[in-house]
Amino acid sequence: MIKSLFYTFLQTKHQEESNNSRDPNYPLFPQEIEIRPIAYFPWEIIKTLTTDEIISKFQLPMEKIRDTMLRHASEEDIYRTKFMSCETNILVKDLDTNTIHQGKLWKHPCENNFALRESWIEEFVKRRRLVVGMVVGMYWDFEACMFCFSVLDGRQ
């Protein structure tokens, strides 16, 4: 979210009643507001959190990783990742709190998905108090080369 400072001429009822309404020099009242940029629906990964994702790891589908992070990799490299154990450090931006966190993206050779593990639990589940049933979304920011994360539906 973007924080902006706006100045307004509007006063509270108390300020309006206590000031002289004939005075042409009304003071400006600064007010800080948060603006979430209006954009197309960018969420490439939308998940309703399960118990496994709260206590263990956040699964990211191989197709989404291939289409985003590995889009410049050759078909041979992508084929090799299916049968190898892979681990890489990535950045994840929490759009709700405007913070950036480092995470480890990991893939086991027997699984077809990538996963965020320990860093997911510490940086997101505990810090944001995520619970089973919340809907979260992620997308890959191509300009910043990082995932962007947000809680889309916080109802429990």
Curated annotation (Swiss-Prot):
A GO MF term: DNA binding
Q: Give the subcellular location.
A: Nucleus
Q: Which residues form a coiled coil?
A: none
- Keywords (A to Z) from UniProt: DNA-binding, Nucleus, Transcription, Transcription regulation
Superkingdom classification of source: Eukaryota
Q: Does the keyword rRNA-binding apply?
A: no
Any one cellular component term from GO for this entry? nucleus
Broad class of the protein's primary localization: nucleus
Per the record, DNA-binding region residues lie at 57-155
Name of this chain's protein: B3 domain-containing protein At5g26805
